Curated annotation (Swiss-Prot):
The chain crosses the membrane at residues 13-33, 34-54, 90-110, 121-141, 145-165, 205-225, 241-261, 306-326, 327-347, 351-371, 455-475, 481-501. It is a multi-pass membrane protein. It comes from Aliivibrio fischeri (strain MJ11). It catalyses: 2 Na(+)(in) + 3 H(+)(out) = 2 Na(+)(out) + 3 H(+)(in). The gene is nhaB. One of its GO terms (cellular component) is plasma membrane. GO terms for molecular function: sodium:proton antiporter activity. The keyword Cell inner membrane applies. This is Na(+)/H(+) antiporter NhaB. It holds the Pfam family NhaB.
């Protein structure tokens, strides 16, 4: 049946997305300029933020790059922000973009080693609770030294590998190397239930690992990008940063691990799914088959990948170069020494991360609108106006937490630390209060932001990855599964800010572990970020 040209244009717009979704996006594009010019630019700015969050929430209906990108282009066109401000945001976050382009591709070339290690862990640890704790703890430990995005890229790579192994067998194509694991049409009805259980099992492990990256990432100055900016502004080095965060990070870490155990034991919020026996059998058979067929060429590849993994951890922990550049070195070393020299073989490695890199650039355009329209200014001003120092600490933590749930935590942390630094320089607050506020800002941006995928770049990457539709991980499901962690991490962090931070910091001073900062040390700290 032929289709008219007009209908063809409508059908092509956002492709297979539902009609109601297309109408919603078109409505946003009509409403935004009207609100901006005839109502209030501030209101239009917040409207854009809400609409962008909507596109993220609907990521399984339509990848957010297209609808979010259209909204961002229009925002720039009508003057909500400028191309220069967007470019400034991209330049300020170039390390994150380099990381996505090169590090995620680098991890792709280490897939054999990762599958080898994690298959042993998955088969070796029979208890789901112990396995969940292992994933959460390992992700936390790695995120204290590596970037959370790198850790999540590793976990996603492993999960896709596990999923593909089972799906290939369940579809009756055990030996096929060209099997499409995104298509369920060949899956036997008897195995479909196992497949659903397996998806639930992988979902829970991924969220545990994702929260683990937040638990570990808050502890050190290299754990998250905003930590580096905060440490820089405060003039703290690696060791001092860890000690200053301890009054909050130690109880939060313990309670986070206890939450991991509790949700698995109670089976709430989508947790508790066990590895189906049929799936375990397939993975064990796969592991035995791999072991039997492994040649010296395969062993040589594993050894090379192991050595590259050591270089990766050492290079990142010691900050020998920008994260993305270390990722590029991983690509070069891994391909050179494992014989991957064809361009088309290398192209696959970049498929996963480049759409997300483009999405992140759009995200920074929205951040540029937040800056130019001063959307957060009323909240920041209200918190800084509070006289009581204890209440100010708690309010900073809460305000950071709430804003980090709707915006990028790197941006929120940067804006707040710059405002507090300005207050210190103007003599509004003391150096001691500045140090305590810096701790509140760091923990506030890192802990409550696990509530939604927009707060943590690692969560957003997971939501928009090729894995999410395979294991049916939607925005709403992520928020629901993160809920127990959000409540525990946010409340324990708040408790630590109110009751532990000041007395324990004073105790650390008395013990001589850290020294009180001076205004001079903050003045000499090199300004970073915005």
């Amino acid at each position: 049946m032929s289709i008219s040209l007009g209908n063809a244009f409508i059908k092509n717009f956002l492709g297979k997305a539902p009609d109601w979704y297309k109408i919603a996006i078109l409505s946003f594009l009509v409403i935004n300029p009207l609100v901006f010019f005839f109502v209030d630019p501030f209101t239009a700015g917040w409207l854009l933020v809400v609409e962008f969050i909507f596109t993220l929430a609907m990521a399984l209906k339509c990848y957010p790059l297209q609808p979010g990108g259209l909204l961002a282009i229009e925002a720039i066109a009508i003057g909500m922000t400028s191309p220069e401000q967007v470019k400034h945001e991209l330049v300020a976050n170039i390390e994150v973009l380099l990381l996505l382009v090169f590090m995620v591709a680098g991890i792709y070339f280490m897939k054999q080693l990762l599958l080898f290690i994690f298959t042993k862990i998955l088969i070796g640890i029979k208890s789901k609770t112990a396995l969940s704790v292992a994933f959460c703890f390992t992700a936390a430990f790695l995120s204290a030294f590596l970037d959370a995005l790198t850790v999540i890229a590793v976990v996603i790579s492993v999960a896709v590998g596990f999923y593909a192994i089972y799906h290939r067998v369940a579809s009756g194509q055990g030996g096929s190397q060209t099997h499409d694991h995104t298509c369920d049409s060949d899956v036997d009805e008897l195995t479909r239930e196992d497949l659903e259980d397996y998806r639930a099992f992988l979902r829970s492990l991924l969220i545990h690992a994702g929260v683990g990256t937040a638990l570990g990432g808050v502890m050190t100055m290299v754990g998250e990008p905003q930590n580096l900016i905060i440490a820089d502004q405060a003039g703290w080095m690696f060791g001092e940063f860890i000690i200053r965060m301890l009054p909050i990070t130690a109880p939060v870490f313990i309670c986070g691990i206890l939450t991991c155990i509790a949700v698995e034991k109670l089976g709430i919020c989508g947790y508790g799914a066990k590895l189906p026996e049929n799936v375990r059998k397939i993975l064990e058979d796969y592991e035995a088959e791999e072991r039997k067929n492994r040649t010296n060429i395969d062993n040589a590849k594993l050894i090379i990948q192991g050595l590259i993994a050591v270089w990766l951890i050492v290079g990142l922990a010691l900050h020998l170069a920008a994260v993305g550049l270390i990722g590029l070195s991983v690509i070069i070393l891994a391909t050179a020494f494992t014989g991957v020299i064809e361009e088309h073989s290398m192209g696959k490695a970049f498929e996963e991360a480049l759409p997300f890199t483009a999405l992140l650039a759009v995200f920074f355009a929205v951040v540029a609108v937040i800056i130019d329209q001063e959307l957060f200014k009323p909240i920041i001003d209200a918190v800084l106006a509070v006289e009581d120092k204890g209440a100010q600490l708690a309010l900073f933590y809460v305000a950071n937490g709430v804003l980090s749930m709707v915006s990028d935590n790197v941006f929120v942390g940067t804006v707040y630390i710059n405002e507090v630094k300005a207050a210190l320089m103007d003599g509004v607050i003391t150096r001691d209060q500045f140090d305590l506020l810096a701790v509140a800002i760091n923990t506030g941006t890192n802990l409550p932001s696990v509530a939604t995928p927009n707060g943590q770049a690692a969560f957003l990457f997971l939501l928009t990855s090729a894995l999410a539709p395979l294991i049916q991980l939607s925005y709403g499901r992520m928020v629901w599964m993160a809920l127990p962690y959000t409540i525990v991490l946010a409340l324990v962090g708040m408790f630590g800010i109110i009751f532990f931070l000041e007395p324990m910091t004073a105790m650390f001073y008395d013990l001589g572990w850290i020294a009180p900062g001076t205004i001079e040390s903050a003045t000499s700290a090199i300004s970073s970020g915005h």
